[in-house]
């Protein structure tokens, strides 16, 4: 049976029966000459039917990874349902290989099409691992950091194996400083700082202004409730905004390794020592599962889920 003879109705029915994707269902029907039951078996053998059923489950565990290649760095997050799978060597190898390809791919859509050592695309390999590992897995996100010159510092917190862990950070320092070792050491220290202090922006001008206005409004209302005069309120609000900046803006935060200095002051000192300008071009901080709504289950539900597979 040729591809043109596969009806949309048959594809739709197979999708409803297996939960697999439309294109996978169409391919299965083509490969099996339109035999419905054989098409189901085809999808099962490929792990696609099982994968689709598991894809409805929330994957908020897993691993983040940081990979640096010269002046390019990438951070990715691959999710699983349980922390147990994150300690699985097969899963770790999958994340490592995806991270290595991500440095070249630059975008997540391109990354999904890249061929892995198995010959399958990244997307296909993730689906196959869903079937073999037995949990929903998701290549959730990636971000790239590229600089023209300087150094990229990387740090992974709570590593399970090198470069894989719960929090992954990259910091790009643009500089023509000759002492690359010292520049790299500074980039690494700032990456550790970012992991621990979770800044929201590099400087106050790049901070989300909606966030600033929301904080300003909260401070204003709070000061007003305290019965302060308007001229005093204005000064109090500005003081609290400055404190807010010192908490969430990277350059204004107290440096983790030298708490008496801000990150900006540490960079200024490094510029004097290295005889070159240093600028933070970008930082990336991925914390595992951030922004994912975790599924709430009671004990009875968990037992039922386990017994039902």
UniProtKB/Swiss-Prot annotation:
Keywords: Cytoplasm, Elongation factor, Protein biosynthesis. GO terms for molecular function: translation elongation factor activity. Its main location: cytoplasm. It is found in: Cytoplasm. The keyword Protein biosynthesis applies. Residues 82-85 are annotated as: Involved in Mg(2+) ion dislocation from EF-Tu. InterPro entries: EF-Ts_dimer_sf, Transl_elong_EFTs/EF1B, Transl_elong_EFTs/EF1B_dimer, Transl_elong_Ts_CS, UBA-like_sf. One of its GO terms (cellular component) is cytoplasm. SUPFAM superfamilies: Elongation factor Ts (EF-Ts), dimerisation domain (SSF54713), UBA-like (SSF46934). Associates with the EF-Tu.GDP complex and induces the exchange of GDP to GTP. It remains bound to the aminoacyl-tRNA.EF-Tu.GTP complex up to the GTP hydrolysis stage on the ribosome. Belongs to the EF-Ts family. PANTHER family: ELONGATION FACTOR TS, ELONGATION FACTOR TS, MITOCHONDRIAL. This is Elongation factor Ts. It comes from Rickettsia rickettsii (strain Sheila Smith). The gene is tsf.
């Amino acid at each position: 049976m040729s591809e043109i003879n596969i009806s949309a109705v048959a594809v739709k029915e197979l999708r409803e029966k297996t939960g697999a994707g439309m294109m996978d269902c169409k391919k299965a029907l083509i490969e099996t000459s339109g035999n419905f039951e054989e098409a189901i078996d085809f999808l099962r053998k490929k792990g696609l039917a099982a994968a689709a059923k598991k894809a409805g489950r929330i994957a908020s565990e897993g691993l983040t990874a940081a990979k640096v290649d010269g002046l390019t760095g990438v951070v990715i997050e691959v999710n699983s349902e349980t922390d147990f799978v994150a300690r699985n060597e097969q899963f770790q190898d999958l994340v490592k290989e995806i991270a290595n390809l991500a440095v070249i791919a630059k975008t997540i859509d391109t990354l999904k099409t890249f061929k892995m050592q198995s010959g399958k695309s990244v997307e296909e390999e993730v689906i196959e691992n869903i079937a073999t590992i037995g949990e929903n897995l998701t290549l959730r996100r990636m971000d790239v950091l590229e600089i023209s010159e300087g150094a990229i510092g990387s740090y992974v917190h709570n590593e399970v194996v090198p470069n894989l862990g719960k929090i992954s950070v990259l910091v790009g320092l643009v500089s023509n400083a000759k002492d690359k070792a010292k520049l790299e050491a500074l980039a690494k220290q700032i990456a550790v700082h970012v992991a621990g202090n979770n800044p929201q922006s590099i400087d106050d001008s790049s901070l989300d202004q909606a966030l600033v206005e929301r904080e300003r409004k909260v401070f204003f209302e709070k000061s007003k409730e305290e019965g302060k005069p308007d001229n005093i309120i204005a000064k109090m609000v500005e003081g609290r905004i400055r404190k807010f900046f010192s908490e969430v803006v990277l350059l204004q935060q107290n440096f983790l390794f030298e708490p008496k200095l801000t990150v900006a002051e540490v960079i200024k000192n490094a510029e004097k020592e290295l005889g070159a300008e240093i600028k933070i071009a970008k930082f990336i901080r991925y914390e595992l599962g951030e922004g994912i709504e975790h599924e709430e289950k009671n004990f009875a539900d968990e037992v039922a889920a386990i017994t039902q597979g």
